[in-house]
């Protein structure tokens, strides 16, 4: 009886000790995470004298900015613990390395670059895709990176700024084969969340998660993605992305994916989260008209492969953060 009693008391003491330890340690972990704002940098691609891709009725730079501002406004309105920083908030030209520099100087938790896709020679395609840093696995992926990186040609000193990088030369992209990104796993996961929302919330064709050598992602020292909202070269998609409904719905999809990522991030660090992801019924905006199912493909195996590669790659050397102060237009 004495043995059983002492063992019972021992269990009580153990529980009390564990509770005390939790009270001492857990709140401090939670408060340390919530002591500072979660910082997200939203990058509207192109701008100013760089129009980006040009469609029949619009320019890419304006679509990108419109959606970027809508995403930022959704976050500001609903997340008082998030600091939103834009690389540009109006029609100005911002050098490619400066965009990443803004994010690095702000010690951002996420970098989201928003773009609009295009195909040459009057070819058409539909759907949204999300990209992470890596070696392009196909000629088509390489062409997307070349097009986005070619904006450095608007900079007079681009050869010096980007160490001789030629955005139109396949040889310049060999560097991405040997480069490792310690944020790859988080970036691929965020990209997967984006694609899920583009398909489920926005009702757009899911073109999947891809990798390519984007300079703006290479220079950012945090989980980073580049979104292609749709194809400005496809008249139907161009009209959709220029409509209030289309831009608003795409922004809502990006916002919901951001909330899901933030919630998972908090749960992983502290076991608790203040972030609430609203259900479809709780939101005012109605989904956009669904695209044909034939436009969608099963991209789950591809995304799982990228995640597996991210987990098996060794941690990379941290990317260097530029030292100039933040000056946001």
Label every model-predicted segment.
Residues 34-165, 180-184, 188-192, 248, ...:
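Catalytic-core regions of hydrolytic enzymes
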Residues 17-29:
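Bacterial N-terminal signal peptides
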Residues 1-16:
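Single conserved hydrophobic/aromatic residue that forms the stacking wall/gate
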Residues 52, 171-273:
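Active-site-adjacent mobile loop/cap segments within catalytic or ligand-binding domains
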Residues 256-329:
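Pro/Ala/Gly-rich low-complexity, hydrophilic intrinsically disordered segments
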Residues 4-6, 113, 233:
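Short linear Ser/Thr-Pro motifs
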